[in-house]
């Protein structure tokens, strides 16, 4: 039975209802600082923690609850005679419930505060109390999540106590919270690219209907700190997002964020099927659609500019899963909402391209994101690309970064007309891209040509310029073919494998 509770919360959501319920059951309530004031002002009978400890709040609030009279009452095992004898001798009363939520370090670390100001939001007393309560969960109910208040109230109403299964779950939530909280603090203080221990702080954003396939369960977690596009987007219309939707949306958004120009990316199964740049939203959508009018069906379309009504009217002519953009005209949004299942996503944050992580069985691979497009760019053939061809070549390299290797993209007039990816050899990727493009002008490759066969194939389709990293021991074979066929070729010095 709960006879004594300690309440100290930053987030006061629901705390009055809980406190008044406890008071109605003759539970003695101890509290601190702002929580004490809040409860007292709202008519709850409450004891200031200073009356229990005999010590005033110290060091600008850094020391309030760090006292044996508090922690002895939390940690004492009730069926341990020696424990109970000791706390009785020391005048310590057991504390049966601890209700604490922490200083909002997750939020404050993102605000425009000084380093020292952020440090002040690292909670010490709160974590110490909830860890103690969680360790002694058989005897102490610990609440850190406002969403758990109602369930605990109902259990007490029905059974006059909280069952051990619930207590254990609540204790587990403490250590789950603390691992995320401590991870955020650790990463803030260390600022190391590859620390000795990789601690990640993510919170469940939503449960998903299923994973990549219907037989796989899934959930979506977002970072507790930092501003990221796939964390802060807003769904303005449509069904709930799926696992595949979020993965695809991430790549589509990253692709359009590569460009300063107005850009559109159509994407299916995590692979771009049409990408274009131009002067207007309507133009780039039309060009992206024309890249592959078959594959775009059931896919995702992303823009890096506000969507207008005219473009929206064209978007709803075909079946799409998602339209994502930094904003939508009011008229455009009304048009898109006529498709009730179409997910319309407003994404204002630019792609951060921070770190890439890939889980393997028993480990996580961590690497810098592929942020470097070019390094030592040089023309290696007798012929140089024209300015227009060079612009298309650079465009092609920005696109090919997001195509699974081996990857080839064929470009014409700011359109990725042919995309060949996911092939186990480069010539197959080239043939696929060239065949899809039909009449492309330039070609971009994510990695070097191991032989001269790609250049030979490109020549058959009338390609005028090629861009690739270079670095093969047989580079001269490709250079020779290009010189013989009148093709210009540029080496970038940067490979863009994507697996």
From Swiss-Prot:
Pathway stated in the Swiss-Prot or TrEMBL entry: Purine metabolism; IMP biosynthesis via de novo pathway; 5-formamido-1-(5-phospho-D-ribosyl)imidazole-4-carboxamide from 5-amino-1-(5-phospho-D-ribosyl)imidazole-4-carboxamide (10-formyl THF route): step 1/1; Purine metabolism; IMP biosynthesis via de novo pathway; IMP from 5-formamido-1-(5-phospho-D-ribosyl)imidazole-4-carboxamide: step 1/1
Gene that specifies this protein: purH
Record protein name field: Bifunctional purine biosynthesis protein PurH
Pfam families per UniProt: AICARFT_IMPCHas (PF01808), MGS (PF02142)
Enzyme Commission number(s): 2.1.2.3, 3.5.4.10
Alphabetized PROSITE patterns for the sequence: MGS
UniProt domain comment: The IMP cyclohydrolase activity resides in the N-terminal region.
Catalytic activity: (6R)-10-formyltetrahydrofolate + 5-amino-1-(5-phospho-beta-D-ribosyl)imidazole-4-carboxamide = 5-formamido-1-(5-phospho-D-ribosyl)imidazole-4-carboxamide + (6S)-5,6,7,8-tetrahydrofolate; IMP + H2O = 5-formamido-1-(5-phospho-D-ribosyl)imidazole-4-carboxamide
InterPro entries registered for this protein in UniProt: AICAR_Tfase_dup_dom_sf, Cytidine_deaminase-like, MGS-like_dom, MGS-like_dom_sf, PurH-like
Sorted UniProt keywords: Hydrolase, Multifunctional enzyme, Purine biosynthesis, Transferase
GO cellular component: cytosol
Residue ranges occupied by any MGS-like domain in the UniProt entry: 1-144
Annotated GO biological process: 'de novo' IMP biosynthetic process
GO molecular function term, any single one: phosphoribosylaminoimidazolecarboxamide formyltransferase activity
Recorded family membership: Belongs to the PurH family.
